[in-house]
Design a protein with these regions (language model features):
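Long, contiguous internal "core" modules enriched in hydrophobic/ aromatic residues
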Residues: 3-341
């Protein structure tokens, strides 16, 4: 019996898992555990070129078979029966060396993304805290300082978005172990003005509150970054938050779709972003998010060499007939576009 057949065998026990009960149905039996040696043999059986068994086994031990599945998926043969998906077998020319290089590229890409998002998050925190703080030191707690739709419309569960946001903030404060939080608890009873408590916010809290700002406040902050109004920046922050979460959890980033395509101003007013309008794929994949980061960093950190480091990283991508940066949304000669010069 081949390893592929062994892998599909059902466990001897057909008892339903006690912790994860499933409804009745015609389910495929769960796959069985394979040793690292069996995993290596299975990859070979499916046609993957492996230059060094020792190196491949070490990578499986270090990274895990299932974690690497997403990286070798594009190298598998496409189905020919009209059904979406791919076969288990690898395409001609697929190699474990390319998979390792792709994984390393994605790892470095995640680090670059987190570097950019840190700068952007800190800058937008200051924007929000400074603008709202002038209005009231507890503006984040006062519905009259925020948008009426954010504070008044129900989410469908009897609570407003503002209520949900406030509960998440309270939980973040309760779990915080920062010295400044302890200081405010002991000296001021725990209540913190916006310019203090905003340091507890994660990117998700920041993004959601920005969406809940009054239109005039959103626009004032957005215009600092060369955007016509706040709907664009709100959309960008949501896309950045998704990418930040993927990167922070060490998940595959390079060819993943963003759940919400970010809004881009018309090319008549923002020619530097015009090439994003030429192909929807560019905005759905990480390239579009990288363009948003570059645009914001030109204001936040104009002397930063982040874009040059991205260009250098792109040179390490294992391009071949099966793998291209186009799958991440990158157009040909992207580095020559006005945005990247």
């Amino acid at each position: 019996m081949s390893l592929a057949s062994v892998r599909r065998c059902s466990p001897t026990s057909q008892a339903r898992d006690f912790f994860f009960p499933r409804p009745e149905g015609p389910y495929t039996p769960l796959k069985v555990h394979l040793t690292f040696e069996q995993q290596l043999a299975l990859l070979k059986e499916r046609g993957l070129e492996i230059e060094s068994d020792t190196r491949c086994k070490a990578a499986l031990q270090r990274l895990g078979y299932y974690r690497l599945v997403g990286y070798w998926y594009p190298l598998r043969k496409p189905r020919t029966d009209g059904v979406l998906g791919r076969l288990d077998e690898f395409q001609q020319g697929a190699s474990f060396d390319a998979i390792e290089r792709l994984y390393e590229f994605d790892k470095q890409l995640r680090l670059l993304v987190l570097d950019a998002i840190e700068r952007i998050e800190v800058a937008v925190r200051v924007d929000v805290a400074y603008l709202l703080g002038k209005r009231h030191r507890f503006a984040h707690e006062r519905p009259e300082c925020l948008d009426a739709n954010f504070t008044g419309q129900s989410t469908g569960k009897g609570r407003t978005r503002f209520t949900v946001w406030s509960e998440k903030l309270a939980l973040s404060v309760a779990n915080a172990r920062d010295d400044f939080v302890a200081h405010h608890r002991h000296k001021y009873g725990g209540r913190m003005p916006i310019w203090v408590v905003i340091e507890v916010w994660d990117f998700g809290l920041l993004s959601k509150l920005f969406s809940g700002l009054q239109f005039k406040d959103q626009r004032k902050i957005a215009q600092r970054y060369g955007l016509p109004d706040g709907q664009y920046l709100a959309s960008w922050l949501r896309a950045l938050n998704f990418s930040r979460n993927v990167a922070a959890h060490h998940s595959r980033l390079w060819n993943r779709n963003v759940p919400e395509v970010p809004k881009i101003p018309p090319k008549s007013t923002h020619p530097v972003l015009h090439h994003l309008h030429e192909n929807p794929q560019r905005l759905r994949r990480i390239y579009g998010v990288l363009c948003l980061m570059r645009h914001l960093l030109r204001t936040i950190a104009p002397e930063c060499d982040w874009h040059e480091r991205l260009k250098m990283l792109s040179g390490t991508f294992p391009s071949n007939e099966l793998l291209t940066l186009g799958a991440a949304g990158f157009p040909l000669d992207w580095e020559k576009a006005q945005l990247w010069t």
